[in-house]
Amino acid sequence: MSYRFSLAYLTVMDATPPEAVQIAAACGYDHVGLRLLPAGNESPFPLLSDARLLRETRAVLQDTGVTVADIEIVRIGAQFDPQRYLPLLERGAELGARHVLVAGDDDNLDRCAGHFARFCELAVQYRLTADLEPMPWTGVKNVRDALQVIETAGSGNGYILIDALHFDRSDSTLEQVAAIAPGRINYVQFCDAPHIDNPTLEQLIFTARDERMLPGAGEIDLKGLLQAIPADTVLSIEVPRKAEARHLSAQQRAQQGLEALKRLIG
């Protein structure tokens, strides 16, 4: 089976967008993920407004043949206004991106679905999909919640994004993943981590954003997850390792992540 691989932003978060593309090409990735808006309260990333950086990034994409799989990140809260994400969508289209990573911060799932549908209406104008990622500390906590939002929204370009870490630390099951309608998953984020019973909010967020493990080095059932997803799913390596970044370059970390996942696949 021939998989396609994408280098996620968090794996090489210390690299600039052009550097991330170059690293992806050097390591043998097919795609790259780029962050334009922050996950927290930081300022927007330079790629969103810096025309020179956009030109440099597009030039490297063209030179290497690497393509942008996804851009990050849209957060849907109770007061969500999709119009404020127009600059993100426009930039994504200029980069040739395919997917937008979406987080659901509203635990009123019906309201979240309405907002998700409105965002999908905008995204489709830029030939982008909206890929909803359940995270256990957000309003959309698990696979069940995400599917409810997507199905209620009823948008043709609305998809679910599975993150191996969040899958493992929520009450989601492999059976739920395997039952997802064909064509509703574009990509899955792979990493590993130790098993923790009843993790705290701080543990959930710290591991997710700072210290994950290479695929195969922890206790997540990654082989089971591979078997549960469609064969044409893009596999994204999302392995932030801030401690190891002190002595390993971004390219070394990207290479290790890809090699680890390929070993797991066999």
Segments the model singles out, each with a brief description of its role:
Residues 1-6, 67-70, 74:
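N-terminal small/glycine-rich loop or linker at the start of catalytic domains
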Residues 1-9, 13-31, 58, 62, ...:
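Histidine-acidic metal/acid-base catalytic patches
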Residues 8-12, 35-39, 73-76, 104-107, ...:
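Active-site beta-loop-alpha junctions enriched in small/polar residues
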Residues 32-33, 71, 100-102, 130, ...:
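Hydrophobic residues within beta-strands of alpha/beta enzymes
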Residues 33-56:
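Glycine-rich, proline-tolerant flexible connector loops at the mouths of alpha/beta enzymes
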Residues 41-48, 74-89, 202-209, 245-246:
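Surface-exposed, active-site-proximal loop segments in enzymatic domains
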Residues 50-69, 121-126, 220-227:
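Alpha-helix-loop-beta-strand connector modules within alpha/beta enzyme cores
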Residues 60-67, 75-159, 169:
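Active-site acidic/histidine proton-transfer and metal-coordination neighborhood
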